Every structure is written in C-alpha cells, then in structure tokens.
C-alpha cells in the first residue's frame, strides 16, 4: 500500500468551507472509515470523461481521488474518453463530426485522429497526472496485449465504431496485483487487425465485468439520472436494474445518456455489484460518492 499521506491530503482537500473546524474533518474521516474498510482490496472501475477532463482544477481533484482510493487499499482501474480533445483536433484539421445515438460516426480520417488523441495524448496526460500526485499508473489501450478484441458496431453503418467482443483480463491482472493503476483508452483491434473507436462507457462496463469489479463509476456532465431533464432536483439517487430498463424503454433516459445506462445494465447483469453515474463537474466527486453515506449521484443496483 502507498503512503498514507495521500489519504490525509485527499481529506484535507475536500470542498469544505474555509475555516471549518477540526471536528468537521474528524466527522468526515469517521464517516469514511466503514467504506474504506469495505472497499479495501476491491476493484473500482472509473470511466473518466466530460468536464473533469478539460478543467485543470477538476483534473487534479480526480487524480488525487484516484490516488487516495489506491492509498487506502482499493484497486482503481481507469477507462477514459477524450471527446473534447478529439473535437478540437477534428475542427483544427477541418474534419466534420457526425453523431448518431450518442456515438461518433468514424471514417478512416477520423479514426487517425481518435488514435492520435486517445492513445498518444490523453492517455499519457492522465498517467502523468496520477503519477504526479504519488500513485503509480500504467497507460494502455485495448490493442495492447490484445486486452480488448473489437468487432464492428451493429451493421457497420457507423464506420470504424466498434463494440467489445472479448476482454482479456489477464493483461491487467498483474498490474493490479502489484499496486499499479491501469489507465485504458478505448481504441481496440479486431481479429482481422482493424482498429476501432469504442465508446468509453461501453469499455468501462465490459472491463468492470471482466475483472469482477465491486463498482463501476461513470464521471459525467450531469448530476446523474433525472426523472425530469429540465428539473435538476429530480435526481434519482438509487434505482434497481429492472427500473432502469423501464426508464430506457420509456425514453426518460435517451441521447448520450443511453449508452451510459446500457453499459451499467450490462455490467450489473455480468456480476458487478453497483454502478454509479455521477457529476464530474463537482470537485472530489469520486470521494463524495464512494466514502459518504449520501453520495452525490445515481446508484444502480441489481436489487434493493
């Protein structure tokens, strides 16, 4: 286990009002203790994306949260997207983007940019950020060691958009066992050697199932799943798997939230204990969701 200094730094940097006394911090630590004990030695798969990737202050908060999870004995595994950065480079190179059902239509020119950005830039920035705050991260993509076998999405009309055919968890098990934090980008190859862009939420769900994760956590730009999209106070804090399917059928969950909800459903159906959709725009959202009684987002479970 890494130095406990990370745990102290993480708690000290929680978003408490200036001047709050030591009793508040003791209360925070006391509330966190049973969760720290519960998740020691458990795998927590985190899909890192949205505004938490683009704002420097949020980036550091996420990296510290991840380091703290590792410091207290949990085993985080990070899956990342990179949509804003991909959009930036596509615009810069005058390549048009098209989305359908929350997925980016990917031709060969777009795929070149996706690979460059996700594997060459974003992945290494995340690894460096986690390493900088005292943990030890290792960057991978689905191609490495045949970690993820891809196949075309649907009927192939999405271009080089893929889905997960198989996960070879043996590639990352030694890293996890030795205290490293795998950081995985969602580019993978088919058995024919064709590279595909896979939705990072989907990859996170399949990785979580393959490694027997306790939790799957998706960092998003929403507060969670809302009963009414126009009412931020209509957050659903806890929901059963069967009720989640009903929300999709009734199109209460739609658009870009659909692949997130579906990946949570698939992960739970394959044995993951809980899935969480939380607001990555809130500093230290991970700690607030994992180590507090109330949490801050939507938790999906197989049963009550």
Curated annotation (Swiss-Prot):
One of its GO terms (molecular function) is acetylglutamate kinase activity. Keywords: Amino-acid biosynthesis, Arginine biosynthesis, ATP-binding, Cytoplasm, Kinase, Nucleotide-binding, Transferase. Its EC number is 2.7.2.8. Gene3D superfamilies: Acetylglutamate kinase-like. The lineage of its organism: Bacteria, Bacillati, Cyanobacteriota, Cyanophyceae, Synechococcales. GO terms for biological process: arginine biosynthetic process via ornithine; L-arginine biosynthetic process. It comes from Prochlorococcus marinus (strain SARG / CCMP1375 / SS120). It is an enzyme of class 2 (transferase). InterPro entries: AceGlu_kinase-like_sf, AcgluKinase_fam, ArgB, Asp/Glu/Uridylate_kinase, Glu/AcGlu_kinase, NAGK-C. Belongs to the acetylglutamate kinase family. ArgB subfamily. Substrate binds at residues 82-83, 104, 197. It is found in: Cytoplasm. Pathway: Amino-acid biosynthesis; L-arginine biosynthesis; N(2)-acetyl-L-ornithine from L-glutamate: step 2/4. It comes from the Bacteria. The keyword Amino-acid biosynthesis applies. The record marks 47, 260 as: Transition state stabilizer. This is Acetylglutamate kinase. The keyword Transit peptide does not apply. CDD domains: AAK_NAGK-C. The gene is argB. GO terms for cellular component: cytoplasm. It catalyses: N-acetyl-L-glutamate + ATP = N-acetyl-L-glutamyl 5-phosphate + ADP.
């Amino acid at each position: 286990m890494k130095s406990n200094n990370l745990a102290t730094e993480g708690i000290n940097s929680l978003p408490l009002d200036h001047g709050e006394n030591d009793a508040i911090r003791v209360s925070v630590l006391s509330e966190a203790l049973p969760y720290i004990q519960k998740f020691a030695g458990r795998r927590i798969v985190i899909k890192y994306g949205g505004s938490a990737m683009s704002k420097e202050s949020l980036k550091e908060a996420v990296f510290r949260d991840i380091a703290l999870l590792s410091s207290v004995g949990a085993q985080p595994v990070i899956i990342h997207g990179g949509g804003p950065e991909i959009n930036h480079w596509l615009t810069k190179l005058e390549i048009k983007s098209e989305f359908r059902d929350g997925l980016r239509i990917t031709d060969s020119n777009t795929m070149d940019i996706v690979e460059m950005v996700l594997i060459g830039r974003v992945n290494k920035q995340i690894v460096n950020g986690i390493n900088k705050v005292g943990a030890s991260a290792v960057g991978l993509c689905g191609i490495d060691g045949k970690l993820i076998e891809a196949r075309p999405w649907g009927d192939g009309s999405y271009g080089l958009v893929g889905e997960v055919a198989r996960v070879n968890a043996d590639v990352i098990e030694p890293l996890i066992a030795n205290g490293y934090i795998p950081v995985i980008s969602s580019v993978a190859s088919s058995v024919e050697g064709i590279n595909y862009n896979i939705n990072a939420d989907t990859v996170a769900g399949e990785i979580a199932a393959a490694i027997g994760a306790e939790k799957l956590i998706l960092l998003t730009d929403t507060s969670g799943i809302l009963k009414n999209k126009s009412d931020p106070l209509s957050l659903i804090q806890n929901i059963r798997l069967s009720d989640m399917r009903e929300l999709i059928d009734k199109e209460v969950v739609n658009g870009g939230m659909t692949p997130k909800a579906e990946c949570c459903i698939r992960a739970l159906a394959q044995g993951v204990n809980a899935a969480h959709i939380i607001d990555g725009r809130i500093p230290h959202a991970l700690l607030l969701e994992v180590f507090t009684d109330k949490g801050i987002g939507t938790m999906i479970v197989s049963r009550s």
